[in-house]
A protein has these predicted regions:
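Thiol/disulfide oxidoreductase modules built on the thioredoxin-like
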Residues: 130-139, 144-195
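N-terminal targeting signals for export/organelle localization
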Residues: 1-58, 197
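Loop/turn elements at helix/coil->beta-strand transitions in domains of secreted/extracellular proteins
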Residues: 79-81, 111-114, 139-140
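A short beta-strand-turn-helix
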Residues: 52-56, 61-82
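Conserved redox-active cysteine motifs that mediate thiol-disulfide chemistry
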Residues: 78, 86-103
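Envelope-exposed proteins and targeting segments
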Residues: 58-60, 114, 160
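Soluble periplasmic/extracytoplasmic beta-strand elements of cell-envelope proteins
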Residues: 85, 117-119, 174-176
Length: 197
């Protein structure tokens, strides 16, 4: 078989496969967007990884404990715009961003906004509280989830993951990984959430 005949045969096979593919059900499959569609991603600046949700999303159900050991659920996150940070003491990026989160709470925390730390550390509340004290972040509200159920419930790929919640306790955005939370860009995100009554 000469070269021209070989190329003609290969071309006919490719063409035939293409016609077959586009005329069968698998060739007509349309790719749908992910159900949890987001409307925008901040594409520049220090918050470039922040993902804003198209519509607020209810948090899945999970529980955690407070300083007294009392079990709480996501209902305690309602009432204020909340920056919910899931972290652990063994997570180096989590440790690095903690002073930024404490600074954000000092500068913007109050009647309308709060930073809440939800430790996924398997060593429990006391270990996490000791770390916050060590880095001067004891001004942050701390809860502990020593089963790491929250991380699984919010489908976090790893730590840290930070969720921005509206006053109804619904997720309106998230950032996976560390961020400079005391930056002007982060404060602008928080102000926009607070102003969206």
């Amino acid at each position: 078989m000469n070269k021209n005949a070989l190329f003609a045969l290969l071309g006919a096979l490719v063409l035939g496969f293409g016609i077959y593919w586009f005329n069968t059900p698998q060739g007509k499959v349309k790719i749908a967007p992910v159900p949890e569609v987001v409307s925008e991603v901040v594409r520049q600046g220090s918050m470039a990884s922040y993902i804003k949700r198209d519509t607020p999303r209810n948090l899945p159900s999970f529980s955690f404990v407070d300083a007294s050991g009392a079990t709480k659920d996501v209902g305690v996150l309602k009432g204020k715009v909340t920056l919910l940070n899931l972290w652990a003491t063994w997570c180096a990026p989590c440790r690095k961003e903690m002073p930024e989160l404490a600074k954000l709470q000092r500068e913007m925390g109050g009647a309308d906004f709060q930073v809440v730390e939800l430790s996924e550390d398997l060593k429990g509340y006391d270990t996490s509280a000791a770390f916050l004290k060590q880095v001067g972040a004891e001004n942050l509200t701390l809860y502990s989830d020593d089963r790491a159920a929250a991380l699984d419930a919010v489908k976090g790929p790893g730590l840290p993951i930070t969720l921005l919640l509206n006053r109804e306790g619904q997720e309106i955005g998230r950032l996976i990984g560390p961020a400079p939370w005391a930056s002007d860009e982060a404060k602008a995100l928080i102000r926009a959430a607070v102003d969206a009554k």
